[in-house]
Amino acid sequence: MQLVHVLVVLLSVVAHAKKFFIPNLKANWHKAHEFCISLDMNMVSVESPKDHDELVQFVRKTDKFSNATRFWLGASDLAEEGVYTWVSSSRLMTFTNWAENEPSSTEAENCVEMIHNTYVNRIWTWNDIDCRGFKAYIVCEERQSIAQFR
């Protein structure tokens, strides 16, 4: 009986570990989504403060980190204006880290980026922006079949 209990605890711990990948290229949101899928990965979902902290800590350790950097998140309101969902799961965004006055929710700004820009005081905050007209770093995460049982 103890073996089963240990296995369940181990699976629970594994289910919460996220593995990120940031390639050395920038793309628009749609190309970023296609790129992650081509690697059998998802665009990153940030569904809790813990997820956000893990992503920030990962980014800070890469060569992509600077005083003015932008990263795509796997969220958009393309399906329904003003209703942001995670592309990998279709779940509504319940945790957010929007910058002040964001999302601005114009019809042209449907995709979500995470910004670290000390010049405009946006420190790891989120912004809605045009999906096609802007290039940012791609953030993919490993797909986890166990994650659906969280």
Swiss-Prot record:
Q: Its induction, per UniProt?
A: (Microbial infection) Up-regulated in salivary gland following infection with Japanese encephalitis virus (at protein level). Up-regulated in hemolymph following infection with Japanese encephalitis virus.
Main localization, broad class: secreted
Extract one GO molecular function annotation from the record. carbohydrate binding
Q: Where is the C-type lectin domain?
A: 18-140
Glycosylated residue positions: N67
Q: Which CDD domains does the entry link to?
A: CLECT (cd00037)
Task: State what protein this is by name.
Answer: C-type lectin mosGCTL-7
Name its species.
Answer: Aedes aegypti (Yellowfever mosquito)
